[in-house]
From Swiss-Prot:
Its EC number is 2.4.1.298. Belongs to the UDP-glycosyltransferase family. An anthocyanidin binds at H16. It comes from Perilla frutescens (Beefsteak mint). UDP-alpha-D-glucose binds at Q340, H355, W358, N359, S360, E363, D379, Q380. It catalyses: an anthocyanidin 3-O-beta-D-glucoside + UDP-alpha-D-glucose = an anthocyanidin 3,5-di-O-beta-D-glucoside + UDP + 2 H(+). It comes from the Eukaryota. This is Anthocyanidin 3-O-glucoside 5-O-glucosyltransferase 2. InterPro entries: UDP_glucos_trans, UDP_glycos_trans_CS. Pathway: Pigment biosynthesis; anthocyanin biosynthesis. The gene is PF3R6.
Length: 443
């Protein structure tokens, strides 16, 4: 019997790679071979980190194409040109791959690789979108471009869209906010128009039925299918205890600073974990406020501050700029990278201060960890709304007049979910409930 082969066309960012690789593992277990199609930059980074040491599982192969940015897009680089080159070169590479490999029977693509769907359709290969944000966000975009733009643009704090919870403006995806350049809305519209090119288009969403039951059925034009949570088995159903990593880290974890060993020395539910993902970089003033807030809490913390490189390729560490770095290192631990799931699953973890990227949100739900939400852009603002109001697993910080977060606000929110009061108990009960439901979703 000939095995089927699915091609996963994946945008070269950690937030896209992690769920795509986890989906690939699920396909392999179901007897389907997988070709993972991404850029040379991502492939090289994945191949050079410890997560790749075990090698590829049988049935999984990688195909990398050069987008002209094999060392990645430099800070301050031309993002528009980068995406244009990615589309032109990626389309050509995919076209040639499908032409010369007739064993690919299906293409699943990231929404930032919408061109992959167009190429696949010209080759008469069926497609599905892998949506790596909540179904609610896809619904908001869909309704915005299909009759609800005026209502959303009006700036109301009671925006009611079909089958979705009431939204206020600050909870909309930032692409739809007035201050966002029009070109970003047009880009998203273009992605959805590609999806609309197929009758009853299939959308695979990193969510599960109990988490977003209404959003998954809100768009008649699409078939939304919850396939999540897309996280390694060891932290979810436990069927494969050895599966402790997504297997595609773009950044090397801090081997010299063993996070788990440090966590082992801390009491249960005592540690504050702080991480704002692989892309976001706060200005120095905001980092200082976060540091002040952590010190004011007086609780042990683990803070992931990613190393940055300047235009000359030299490493810069934000922690070195902090005026309170000495005090911070006495009270907590600062690392440049760590295995987030290992941290979230550790008994010492008490709460997660996060930017609310969707992968981080799904991981915190699956591990039963309360959240302090500090959303910045894209879907993060909507994710924070869902965490606080729909699922009740955390609290969202209040921004100051300058759009930042004061240290005292960080302290206030951390204490709300950790001080043992009524709010703490409610948030923890909800976190455990969703942890249980996430595991049941795999049944």
């Amino acid at each position: 019997m000939v095995r089927r082969r699915v091609l996963l066309a994946t945008f070269p960012a950690q937030g896209h790679i992690n769920p795509a690789l986890q989906f690939a593992k699920r396909l392999l277990k179901a007897g389907t071979d997988v070709t993972f199609f991404t850029s040379v930059y991502a492939w090289r980074r994945m191949a050079n980190t410890a997560s790749a040491a075990a090698g590829n599982p049988p049935g999984l192969d990688f195909v990398a194409f050069s987008d002209g940015y094999d060392d990645g897009l430099k800070p301050g680089g031309d993002g528009k040109r980068y995406m244009s080159e990615m589309k032109a070169r990626g389309s050509e590479a995919l076209r040639n791959l499908l032409l010369n490999n007739d064993d690919v029977t299906f293409v699943v693509y990231s929404h930032l690789f919408a061109w992959a769907a167009e190429v696949a359709r010209l080759s008469h290969v069926p497609t599905a979108l892998l949506w790596v944000e909540p179904a609610t966000v896809l619904c908001i975009y869909h309704f915005y471009f299909n009759g609800y733009a005026d209502e959303i643009d009006a700036g109301s704090n009671e925006i009611q869209l079909p089958r979705l919870p009431s939204l206020e403006q600050r909870s909309l995806p930032t692409f739809l906010l007035p201050a966002t350049p029009e070109r970003f809305r047009l880009m998203m519209k273009e992605k959805l128009e590609t999806l609309d090119g197929e009758e009853k288009a299939k959308v695979l969403v990193n969510t599960f039925d109990a988490l977003e039951p209404d959003a998954l059925t809100a768009i008649d034009r699409y078939e939304l299918i919850g396939i999540g949570p897309l996280i390694p088995s060891a932290f979810l159903d436990g069927e494969d205890p050895s599966e402790t990593s997504y297997g595609g880290d773009l950044f090397e974890k801090s081997e010299e600073n063993n996070c788990v060993e440090w966590l082992n020395s801390k009491p249960k539910s005592s540690v504050v974990y702080v991480s704002f993902g692989s892309v976001l970089r706060f200005p120095k003033a905001q980092m200082e406020e976060i540091g002040k807030g952590l010190l004011a809490c007086g609780r042990p913390f683990l803070w992931m501050i990613r190393e940055q490189k300047n235009d000359d390729g030299e490493e810069e560490e934000e922690e070195e700029e902090l005026s309170c770095i000495g005090e911070l290192k006495k009270m907590g631990k600062i690392v440049s990278w760590c295995s987030q799931l290992e941290v979230l699953a550790h008994p010492a973890l008490g709460c997660f201060v996060t930017h609310c990227g969707w992968n981080s949100a799904v991981e915190s739900l699956s591990c039963g960890i309360p959240v302090v939400a500090v959303p910045q852009w894209f879907d993060q603002t909507t994710n924070a709304k869902l965490i606080e109001d729909a699922w009740g697993t955390g609290v969202r910080v209040r921004m100051n007049e300058g759009g930042g977060v004061d240290g005292c606000e960080i302290e206030r929110c951390v204490e709300m979910v950790m001080d043992g009061g009524d709010k703490t108990k409610l948030v923890r009960e909800n976190a455990i409930k969703w942890k249980t439901l996430a595991r049941q979703a795999m049944g």
